[in-house]
Amino acid sequence: MTRVIHTGDTHVGYQQYHSPERRADFRRAFDAVVEDAIDEGVDAVVHAGDLFHDRRPELPDLMAVLSALRRLDDAGIPFLAVVGNHEATRTGEWLDLFEGTGLATRLSEAPVRIGDTAFYGLDWVPESRRDDLAYELEAPDADHAALVSHGLFT
């Protein structure tokens, strides 16, 4: 059985109430997810979007997440993710950068198999475009399948 930690809406970089302490809390919370994944020896960490609070995360936040993803990579734990509404842009997202470095995998309609589970992903889609959404998934070559999305779809 595939064991994962599923998380989302971590909003690294969010300075809630304009408080630097709250900003640090969001970073620590993401670090805790990573440490739990390593301590538990899970097969993957699955993130359902809004890793960052902003479309243009500040360098200290990018570096903190980069360090956390390196720790996962060093432990042999893949980081699978989709893009959320707080970080979606027309020209590219943080996930493209981390995928390019080999530290993350952007989930899509093509399955990513981890153990006995095929993972698929759907980035955030604005509500105005959801009725026209055509999304076809490849049949999984796995015992189980999971679709990770950011947003509510019916």
Predicted ranges, named:
Residues M1-L66:
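N-terminal active-site segment of His-dependent metallophosphoesterases
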Residues P57-T154:
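His/Asp/Glu-rich metal-coordinating catalytic cores
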